[in-house]
Amino acid sequence: MTEFQDPFLKSGEPVKFDKKYIDSTIRPGDIGIADQWAVKPVSDPFVGNLETPVNSGYFTKAFINNLPFYRSGISPNFRGLEVGAAFGYLLYGPFAMTGPLRNTDFALTAGLLSTIGAVHILTALFVLYTAPGKDPNVQPSDCTVENPPTDLFTRTGWTDFTSGFWLGGCGGAVFAWLLCGTLHLDTIMPIVKGVWAAG
């Protein structure tokens, strides 16, 4: 037994920690001791978020900071609208081309309905992210994203993002459905369906 351990073992009182080790922004009744002592990303140097030529290069920083999630000067609702439109538009193709009704006349409509269903599931997950009553986790600044959007990481901002995502996702799916349903693409669809059905 070392000299450091001996006083703690002999005394019957609980060990008191120094105030500098306790996060004073969190009320003790809100969370348990495990959350209070949890390792926080980026601020801890042992996490491994290091500045490398890949994550701190000009191209990477310009690309990441121009994504709708990190772009400055837009509202959370518009962020969600852009992200949702991309998801809805890109999810439509796999559902329409590889779905169980791909060789029928209802392939395009089944793809649309499947995509809208997937957007609804993703929207429900966004809603559940803040359902327990806590605000979303605020992303700290790092070497790639120096100014993360602070208005997005509030309950109101996340709710606006979620509603924009739902509207954009459904709109992107309908837009892709309209594009695939036009006459000039109708001749290409059997070729694409034949490629996927060959396997």
Curated annotation (Swiss-Prot):
Transmembrane segments annotated in the record for this chain: 81-101, 108-128, 165-185
Alphabetically ordered keywords of this record: Membrane, Photosynthesis, Photosystem I, Thylakoid, Transmembrane, Transmembrane helix
Pfam families for the chain: PsaL (PF02605)
Membrane topology term: Multi-pass membrane protein
Cleavable signal peptide: none
Entry's localization field: Cellular thylakoid membrane
HAMAP family xref list: PSI_PsaL
Family, as annotated: Belongs to the PsaL family.
Protein name: Photosystem I reaction center subunit XI
Taxonomic placement: Bacteria, Bacillati, Cyanobacteriota, Cyanophyceae, Synechococcales
